[in-house]
């Protein structure tokens, strides 16, 4: 029998899948660039990835950020509910419970930081530094 949390988890997980699918659809053929940007550990590499995109790619890339402003909240709620449900079906230490409660907030916050920085860097290439790129890559 499904519990209330099970139903919420199913609903928020479905919302996550829909959200991720929409982000991928908006990105289209530009999707691989996201991973390249997220794993660029230097300013020259970051600039090279952005320079490899044509105008249409940049439009798609920029557009994905707006959908990705909703996505972290969705996956954060799904993860939080999943952690609560896990605590209902198995014994968890207080430390584990606290970690499971904090992890979705930390993960979503990191995604928001990555999104805001990524959007900023699209229009402010002078701010693309090794420190900014490495910090953002570590957060993402």
Task: Label the model's feature ranges.
Residues 1-140:
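Short amphipathic, positively biased membrane-proximal segments
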């Amino acid at each position: 029998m499904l519990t209330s949390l099970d139903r919420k988890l199913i609903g928020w997980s479905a919302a996550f899948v829909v959200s991720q699918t929409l982000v991928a659809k908006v990105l289209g053929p530009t999707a691989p660039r996201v991973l390249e940007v997220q794993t660029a550990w230097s300013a020259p590499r970051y600039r090279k990835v952005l320079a490899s995109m044509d105008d249409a790619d940049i439009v798609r890339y920029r557009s994905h950020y707006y959908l990705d402003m909703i996505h972290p909240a969705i996956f954060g709620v799904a993860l939080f509910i999943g952690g609560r449900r896990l605590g209902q079906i198995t014994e968890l230490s207080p430390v584990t419970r606290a970690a499971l409660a904090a992890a979705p907030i930390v993960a979503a916050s990191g995604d928001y930081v990555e999104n805001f920085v990524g959007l900023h860097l699209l229009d402010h290439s002078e701010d693309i530094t090794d420190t900014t790129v490495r910090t953002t890559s570590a957060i993402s």
